[in-house]
């Protein structure tokens, strides 16, 4: 066995989370020695891959499940506002890197694509109108447009209006400042940027086989998948950012904070169209409402995707079930994750989520014709020969202890960290990649509290002139920061002079 290497930071998984955290830490302390270890032979091979990622550029502009109606019919926009400001924080980091000049062009990973919400029927229209009235009063959504006019709708979403019944009651809202983000390209751009920094290694085809306490830090055992050799790395801090594999790695650590967590894997499928004659008629991300009783992951949307400069359309998601935690994982992932500490929450979730189980089974059993029927609700003239089924990435939803129910299924992400801040893991799924930077900032503040208050404070303020809370309330600051980010990311033509955020 090779002699132990010593580093400051080990990051497990070469996806968007680890890549973001690694680059951010090197900006804050260029002297840090860090290593990224990844099982696959490239970065962004799982959920960060553009064909695996369920939704991109989430900014709360069009996702109707972020603005649920209350019992009295009013709309709560808090979650949409929060996700919007989190996305603006992500844009601040990308803009900071783009301005450096050594990072490369932002056009390789972010493109302007309008975000639309689309509803059908009287109830849908009533909901969307109320939502529009509530959201357009907030500065983050002040440019939102609403229409029920068929001619206007035909301009906004021509593919979706052709062949539709003239008397069908429909409505839509539009935000022109939406984006499509290729998180695979962004991840690899971050990793390339990282690999040029001193004291930084990215090791592919490497499997973490052990994680044990060593003094104030950790010893990470890593097996070379190709050669079979094993080495040990001593690290002061370990981040488990391995997507669905983060849960078993967290369990391997044995930290008290990991007890009681379980995972519920959900796979996804998409219909994909690359026919340029179809694709050219749809330049938008259009989200609608999930069917009554369906989980939030089932919100249907028809998206323009830009990957490597080529446009495609994706429609879905169609959910599925497998016991794998990663697309390239093992069918034993779920059974091997069962522990004494999490079996009660997992059984409680199984008991209380029979509707979800039935939904997943029904999705798995769908024929191609049934999937096309769902698509034709959006695109009435869809032809079977233009679309093919693609398997998306794995999402592992969080199961956690609950005092009343025994266990609950949680949709979203959760940061789990050791009490001493020496180890952290990211569990869960949506909104995921779009709010990566906010999540990694939370991790840094939680695991390195002293440094964020002292030696890292000025650099953090330079990179992030405005954080989420102030962006939620200060309209002028929001406008200024957002405009400068958009210019740096080449989303709009440059108009404003560079100015202080003070």
From Swiss-Prot:
Cofactor(s) the protein requires to work: FAD
Reaction equations catalysed: (S)-malate + a quinone = a quinol + oxaloacetate
Any one Pfam family match given in the protein's UniProt record, by short name: Mqo
GO BP term, pick one: tricarboxylic acid cycle
Pathway: Carbohydrate metabolism; tricarboxylic acid cycle; oxaloacetate from (S)-malate (quinone route): step 1/1
Superkingdom per UniProt: Bacteria
Enzyme superclass (EC): oxidoreductase
GO molecular function: 2-hydroxyglutarate dehydrogenase activity; L-malate dehydrogenase (quinone) activity
InterPro entries to which the protein is assigned, alphabetical: FAD/NAD-bd_sf, MQO
Keyword list, A-Z: FAD, Flavoprotein, Oxidoreductase, Tricarboxylic acid cycle
EC number: 1.1.5.4
Family: Belongs to the MQO family.
Entry protein name: Probable malate:quinone oxidoreductase
């Amino acid at each position: 066995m090779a002699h132990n290497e010593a580093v400051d930071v080990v990051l497990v998984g070469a996806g968007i989370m680890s890549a973001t955290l690694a680059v951010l830490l090197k900006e804050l302390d260029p002297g840090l020695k860090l290593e990224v270890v990844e099982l696959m032979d490239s970065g962004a091979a799982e959920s960060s891959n553009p064909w695996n990622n369920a939704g991109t550029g989430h900014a709360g502009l069009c996702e109707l499940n972020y603005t649920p109606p209350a019992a009295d019919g009013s709309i709560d926009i808090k979650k949409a506002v929060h996700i919007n400001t989190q996305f603006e924080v992500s844009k601040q980091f990308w803009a900071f890197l783009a301005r450096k000049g050594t990072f490369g062009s932002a056009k390789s990973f972010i493109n302007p694509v309008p975000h639309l919400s689309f509803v059908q029927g009287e109830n849908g229209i009533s909901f969307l109108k109320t939502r529009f009235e509530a959201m357009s009063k907030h500065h983050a959504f002040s440019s939102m447009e609403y229409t029920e006019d068929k001619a206007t709708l035909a301009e906004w979403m021509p593919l979706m209006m052709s062949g539709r019944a003239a008397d069908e009651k429909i409505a839509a809202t539009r935000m022109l400042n939406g984006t499509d983000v290729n998180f695979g390209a962004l991840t690899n751009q971050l990793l390339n940027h990282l690999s040029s920094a001193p004291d930084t290694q990215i090791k592919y085809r490497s499997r973490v086989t052990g994680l044990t306490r060593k003094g104030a830090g950790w010893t990470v055992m890593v097996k070379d998948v190709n050669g079979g050799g094993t080495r040990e790395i001593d690290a002061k801090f370990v981040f488990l950012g391995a997507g669905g594999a983060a849960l078993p790695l967290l369990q391997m650590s044995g930290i008290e904070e990991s007890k009681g967590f379980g995972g519920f894997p959900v796979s996804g499928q998409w219909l994909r169209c690359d026919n340029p004659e179809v694709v050219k008629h749809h330049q938008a991300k259009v989200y609608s409402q999930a069917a009554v009783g369906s989980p939030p992951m089932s919100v249907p949307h028809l998206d323009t995707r830009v990957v490597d400069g080529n446009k495609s359309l994706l429609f879905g998601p169609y959910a599925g079930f497998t016991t794998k935690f990663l697309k390239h994982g093992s069918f034993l992932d779920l059974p091997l994750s069962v522990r004494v500490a999490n079996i009660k929450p997992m059984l409680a979730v199984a008991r209380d989520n029979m509707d979800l189980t039935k939904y997943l089974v029904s999705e798995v059993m769908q024929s191609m014709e049934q999937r096309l029927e769902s698509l034709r609700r959006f695109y009435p003239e869809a032809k079977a020969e233009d679309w093919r089924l693609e398997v998306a990435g794995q999402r592992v939803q969080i199961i956690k202890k609950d005092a009343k129910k025994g266990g609950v299924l949680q949709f979203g992400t959760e940061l789990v960290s050791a009490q001493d801040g020496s180890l952290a893991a990211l569990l869960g799924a949506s909104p995921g990649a779009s709010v990566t930077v906010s999540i990694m900032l939370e991790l840094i503040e939680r695991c390195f509290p002293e440094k964020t208050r002292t030696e890292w404070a000025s650099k953090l303020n330079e990179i992030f002139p405005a954080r989420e809370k102030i962006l939620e309330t200060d309209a002028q600051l929001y406008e200024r920061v957002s405009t400068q980010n958009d210019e740096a990311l080449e989303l709009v033509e440059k108009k404003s002079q560079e100015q202080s955020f003070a």
